[in-house]
Amino acid sequence: MGSINRAGIAGDLKTMRIHIAVLLTMFLAPLSAIADPEFFDEGPMAGKGYPFSESVRVGNILFISGQVGVDENNELVEGGITGETRQIISNIGGALARRGLGFSDVVKCTVFLADVAEWGEFNTIYTSYFEPPYPARSALGANGLALGARLEVECVAAYPSD
């Protein structure tokens, strides 16, 4: 077995500390430059008295509130998981378009399913709108979704760098 070179370890630790300091500066500096949030209340659920905004922009990030399969009359669409999924993705597309973005700008989605067994049906429709590279995504079972919906989807999108 070889011996431990303590001078080499000390040098590696010093280099590692410098790298950590540089990384912290890179990640923490932008936090101080974050813009004030902009709140947008548009889309099919706007003006209905719900206690949330359709979307919120902070800097170059757009947060889209959870969407359920409601149409412009605030009615849950028919067709179960298939009809609701298509309506939700249409609603998300509208929220993105109103802010000058598209599906390719989405970086994260969270999917809440009343019945996880319907994940496959949802996924088939989802992949017809989102293309590789796909956004990061979580999917989980949820009991008691708003308006008796089969699913709810929220997304985060990023504005392209200038």
Residue ranges and their predicted role:
Residues 2, 8-11:
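Residue-identity detector for glycine
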Residues 5-6, 99:
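Proteins with a high burden of low-complexity, intrinsically disordered sequence enriched in S/T/G/P/A and R
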Residues 14-19:
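Positively charged n-region of N-terminal signal peptides that target proteins for export
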Residues 20-27, 31-90, 94-108, 113-162:
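N-terminal presequence-like segments and the immediate start of the first folded domain
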